[in-house]
Amino acid sequence: MAQASTRTSTTRAPLLVSFLFFYASKVNQLSIAIAGQDFVMVAADTRISSGFSILSREYSRTTKLTEKTVITSSGMVADIENLHKLLIAKVKTYQRQFKKSPSTESLAQLLGNTLYSRRFMPIYAFNLLCGLDAQGQGSVYGYDAIGSFDKLTYGVQGSGSQLGAPILDN
Protein backbone atom coordinates (compact mmCIF):
# COMPACT_ATOMS: atom_id res chain seq x y z
CA MET A 1 0.00 0.00 0.00
CA ALA A 2 1.42 3.36 -1.00
CA GLN A 3 1.75 5.99 1.69
CA ALA A 4 0.70 9.55 1.15
CA SER A 5 3.43 12.17 1.25
CA THR A 6 3.54 14.16 4.47
CA ARG A 7 5.26 17.14 2.83
CA THR A 8 3.04 20.07 2.19
CA SER A 9 3.66 23.23 0.24
CA THR A 10 4.25 25.11 3.51
CA THR A 11 7.37 23.08 4.27
CA ARG A 12 8.98 23.84 0.92
CA ALA A 13 9.18 27.62 1.28
CA PRO A 14 11.53 27.61 4.32
CA LEU A 15 13.70 25.03 2.57
CA LEU A 16 13.97 27.24 -0.51
CA VAL A 17 14.83 30.34 1.54
CA SER A 18 17.42 28.46 3.60
CA PHE A 19 18.94 27.06 0.39
CA LEU A 20 19.22 30.56 -1.12
CA PHE A 21 20.91 31.95 1.99
CA PHE A 22 23.24 28.93 2.13
CA TYR A 23 24.12 29.37 -1.54
CA ALA A 24 24.70 33.11 -1.16
CA SER A 25 26.90 32.62 1.89
CA LYS A 26 29.27 30.39 -0.06
CA VAL A 27 30.26 33.17 -2.46
CA ASN A 28 33.86 34.16 -1.67
CA GLN A 29 34.35 37.89 -1.17
CA LEU A 30 36.11 40.50 0.93
CA SER A 31 35.62 44.23 1.55
CA ILE A 32 37.91 46.26 3.81
CA ALA A 33 37.71 49.93 4.89
CA ILE A 34 40.02 51.94 7.15
CA ALA A 35 39.22 55.44 8.46
CA GLY A 36 41.89 57.99 9.41
CA GLN A 37 41.99 61.62 10.52
CA ASP A 38 41.39 62.99 7.03
CA PHE A 39 41.03 59.95 4.79
CA VAL A 40 39.19 56.71 4.18
CA MET A 41 40.82 53.79 2.41
CA VAL A 42 38.53 51.20 0.80
CA ALA A 43 39.52 47.92 -0.83
CA ALA A 44 37.38 45.11 -2.21
CA ASP A 45 38.06 42.06 -4.30
CA THR A 46 36.68 41.84 -7.82
CA ARG A 47 36.00 38.13 -8.07
CA ILE A 48 32.62 36.42 -8.00
CA SER A 49 32.94 32.71 -7.35
CA SER A 50 30.77 29.87 -6.17
CA GLY A 51 32.53 26.77 -4.98
CA PHE A 52 35.21 26.00 -7.53
CA SER A 53 33.58 28.06 -10.30
CA ILE A 54 34.76 31.60 -11.03
CA LEU A 55 31.84 33.53 -12.48
CA SER A 56 33.64 36.85 -12.99
CA ARG A 57 37.01 38.40 -12.25
CA GLU A 58 36.01 42.01 -12.96
CA TYR A 59 33.03 42.81 -10.72
CA SER A 60 33.28 46.02 -8.68
CA ARG A 61 31.75 45.79 -5.20
CA THR A 62 32.42 49.48 -4.58
CA THR A 63 30.09 52.26 -5.76
CA LYS A 64 30.63 56.01 -5.47
CA LEU A 65 27.52 57.67 -4.03
CA THR A 66 28.80 61.26 -3.64
CA GLU A 67 32.15 63.05 -3.88
CA LYS A 68 32.85 62.13 -0.25
CA THR A 69 31.02 58.81 0.18
CA VAL A 70 31.36 55.30 -1.24
CA ILE A 71 29.71 52.00 -0.41
CA THR A 72 31.24 48.55 -0.65
CA SER A 73 29.17 45.41 -0.18
CA SER A 74 29.49 41.66 0.20
CA GLY A 75 26.69 39.15 -0.22
CA MET A 76 24.35 38.12 -3.01
CA VAL A 77 25.41 39.95 -6.16
CA ALA A 78 21.86 40.58 -7.41
CA ASP A 79 20.90 42.17 -4.08
CA ILE A 80 24.10 44.25 -4.07
CA GLU A 81 23.36 45.59 -7.57
CA ASN A 82 19.77 46.39 -6.63
CA LEU A 83 20.78 48.15 -3.39
CA HIS A 84 23.50 50.25 -5.05
CA LYS A 85 21.13 51.36 -7.85
CA LEU A 86 18.47 52.25 -5.28
CA LEU A 87 20.93 54.33 -3.24
CA ILE A 88 22.22 56.14 -6.34
CA ALA A 89 18.63 57.01 -7.30
CA LYS A 90 17.90 58.33 -3.78
CA VAL A 91 21.11 60.41 -3.81
CA LYS A 92 20.18 61.93 -7.20
CA THR A 93 16.69 62.74 -5.92
CA TYR A 94 18.18 64.41 -2.83
CA GLN A 95 20.62 66.43 -4.97
CA ARG A 96 17.82 67.60 -7.28
CA GLN A 97 15.54 68.54 -4.41
CA PHE A 98 18.04 70.29 -2.09
CA LYS A 99 20.72 71.41 -4.60
CA LYS A 100 23.50 69.80 -2.52
CA SER A 101 24.91 66.36 -1.83
CA PRO A 102 23.82 64.43 1.27
CA SER A 103 26.37 64.07 4.06
CA THR A 104 28.00 60.77 4.94
CA GLU A 105 26.03 60.68 8.20
CA SER A 106 22.75 61.17 6.30
CA LEU A 107 23.61 58.38 3.89
CA ALA A 108 24.53 56.12 6.82
CA GLN A 109 21.06 56.61 8.31
CA LEU A 110 19.40 56.25 4.88
CA LEU A 111 21.11 52.92 4.28
CA GLY A 112 20.13 51.67 7.73
CA ASN A 113 16.50 52.67 7.14
CA THR A 114 16.48 51.09 3.68
CA LEU A 115 17.81 47.78 4.97
CA TYR A 116 15.48 47.82 7.99
CA SER A 117 12.44 48.43 5.80
CA ARG A 118 13.16 45.07 4.14
CA ARG A 119 13.79 43.17 7.40
CA PHE A 120 11.12 40.52 6.75
CA MET A 121 12.64 39.66 3.36
CA PRO A 122 16.13 41.07 3.84
CA ILE A 123 18.50 42.33 1.21
CA TYR A 124 21.34 39.82 1.47
CA ALA A 125 24.14 42.39 1.47
CA PHE A 126 26.63 43.24 4.20
CA ASN A 127 27.77 46.80 3.66
CA LEU A 128 30.51 49.22 4.58
CA LEU A 129 29.56 52.85 3.97
CA CYS A 130 32.71 54.98 3.95
CA GLY A 131 33.37 58.66 3.59
CA LEU A 132 34.44 61.95 5.10
CA ASP A 133 32.13 63.49 7.69
CA ALA A 134 31.27 67.19 8.09
CA GLN A 135 34.55 67.83 9.96
CA GLY A 136 36.62 66.12 7.24
CA GLN A 137 37.43 63.03 9.33
CA GLY A 138 37.16 59.53 7.92
CA SER A 139 34.09 57.50 8.82
CA VAL A 140 33.32 53.82 8.29
CA TYR A 141 29.86 52.44 9.03
CA GLY A 142 29.39 48.66 9.18
CA TYR A 143 25.96 47.08 8.55
CA ASP A 144 24.28 43.73 8.88
CA ALA A 145 21.55 42.50 6.53
CA ILE A 146 18.66 44.09 8.47
CA GLY A 147 20.06 47.58 8.91
CA SER A 148 21.82 47.58 12.27
CA PHE A 149 24.94 49.71 11.95
CA ASP A 150 27.82 51.11 13.94
CA LYS A 151 30.53 53.68 13.28
CA LEU A 152 33.92 51.96 13.14
CA THR A 153 37.59 52.87 12.78
CA TYR A 154 37.95 49.98 10.36
CA GLY A 155 35.57 47.42 8.93
CA VAL A 156 35.77 44.04 7.23
CA GLN A 157 32.83 42.32 5.51
CA GLY A 158 32.44 39.15 3.49
CA SER A 159 33.34 35.50 3.72
CA GLY A 160 37.04 36.42 3.69
CA SER A 161 36.69 38.52 6.84
CA GLN A 162 38.25 35.73 8.92
CA LEU A 163 41.46 36.38 7.00
CA GLY A 164 41.23 40.18 6.82
CA ALA A 165 40.23 41.05 10.39
CA PRO A 166 43.36 39.66 12.14
CA ILE A 167 45.60 41.72 9.85
CA LEU A 168 43.74 44.92 10.77
CA ASP A 169 43.70 44.02 14.48
CA ASN A 170 47.50 44.24 14.54
Where in the sequence are the language-model features?
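Long, low-complexity N-terminal extensions
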Residues: 1-170
